[in-house]
Amino acid sequence: MRGGKQPRRDPDDPRRTLGATGEGLAARHLEARGFEIIDRNFRTRQGELDLVASDARFLVFCEVKTRIAHGEPGPLGPLAAIGVRKRRQVRAMAREWLGARAPDARFDSGSPPEIRFDAIGLTLDAHGRLLALEHLEGAF
């Protein structure tokens, strides 16, 4: 969407449900790897940060893309939807998050860790079961 107001968020929109399912699976994936989820769905003027996580080394801003598999998987997975514009948008949202939330965030080392931008792509079957998860650390 360009400029202006963002469209109203319909809680019954199937895309919203799919996104929430994917974000939950991605959060569990990160937690299983030792990350603490410190924020979810942080709203900014540019959009919404999906997940913010931290461990002793990194503060990770994570973009999550979830798709339903229809037949045979194609050559491009969910992560193909993260183009140049989206990467720029996530960086801008991260700056906004840092200004608003970083002073209140608690980090194990006492100081903020190194910042990293990850991407997690999930493919689900028609019943919402996880078929594939791809996690790109330092994706952009």
Q: Where would I find each of the regions flagged by the language model?
A:
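Acidic-basic catalytic patches of nuclease active cores, encompassing PD-(D/E)XK
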Residues: 1-40
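Short, charged, intrinsically disordered terminal tails
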Residues: 9, 102, 131-135
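Conserved catalytic cores of phosphodiester-cleaving nucleases, focusing on short active-site segments
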Residues: 30, 51-71, 90
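Residues at secondary-structure transition points
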Residues: 13, 17, 21, 46, ...
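Short, low-complexity, polybasic intrinsically disordered segments
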Residues: 119-140
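Active-site metal-binding core of divalent-cation-utilizing nuclease and nuclease-like domains
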Residues: 36-59
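Catalytic cores of nucleic-acid endonucleases
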Residues: 66-126
